[in-house]
Amino acid sequence: MQIVIIKEFSNIPLLDHFSESKEICLVAHPDFAAQYGLRYYLKVRQKLQQKLPCHHIDLGIACDDLPGFALEVIAAKVDRLYFLKTSPYWTQIESLCQQEGILIFNQQELSCLL
């Protein structure tokens, strides 16, 4: 799976860049995810899926240590959630993700998000 960190739609590389991988995970950068809002990134995924119909596109949102935003992301049922495992909220957020079938990752493992 090819992981692409995005800030805004114009930040996504050229479409021919994706031809090598049929699975793409767009990850909204934490500095921009809360600012632009979840709907923005859902639209980005939708637009990219329309342009690349033969690809499977997951959406991941990086939330830093913002439990309120993480709850919004979980409610929207995105594919992946990136959260700081050092957060005191990790256990609760992880449990909710498991209940909803959302993959949760330690945000610190993606150095490009730090």
Q: Could you describe each region identified by the protein language model?
A:
Residues 2-6, 22-28, 57-63, 80-83, ...:
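Hydrophobic faces of well-ordered beta-strands that scaffold small-molecule active sites
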Residues 8-10, 66:
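Helix N-cap/beta->alpha junction signal
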Residues 10-13, 33-46, 85-99:
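Active-site-adjacent beta->alpha loops and helix N-cap segments on the catalytic face
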Residues 14-15, 73:
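Conserved, mostly hydrophobic/aromatic
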Residues 15-21:
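Glycine-rich phosphate/diphosphate-binding loops that line cofactor/substrate pockets in enzymes
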Residues 27-76:
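N-terminal active-site wall of soluble small-molecule enzyme domains
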